Amino acid sequence: KDWPDNNVQLWRTREDDGSDYGDTKWRYMLYDTEYSMNLWGQDNNGNTNRLQEARNKDALFDALCKNDSFKQSLADTLMDLADKNFKSADAAKKLDAMAAVYRPLMEQYKKRFGNGDVDSRVRDMKSFMANRKSQIKKHIQESLSITVK
């Protein structure tokens, strides 16, 4: 599992260099997120409420989630991501394009190591994508007690 207790870092520049991110402010970084797309078939429907899990495991995040302004901003941002960046049809097209590039390599991998069903993994990820927006809404409502559109 990638988040909330793994694959995260904080970073900042030590001196203000005048660039957008060179202002000495602390920034959050999430990396190595292969589990976030259900790559291994662990959560086909996106039922695991990672937002609530993060609240349970991180006292600072939980405290922020008790602030009405932060809650609304977080909910709005998550829904913007669901509507734009995570739009199911667009994400599926990108996934198909990536799968087409990697499929020949995965066939070689499968011959060599005996596993690696690309088509099955692509189906799992597409199923996850199709359910993601409704699950994001559900998790926001359950974890933040906010009704979203």
Q: Residue ranges of each PLM-predicted region?
A:
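Middle-to-C-terminal accessory/interaction subdomains
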Residues: K1-K149
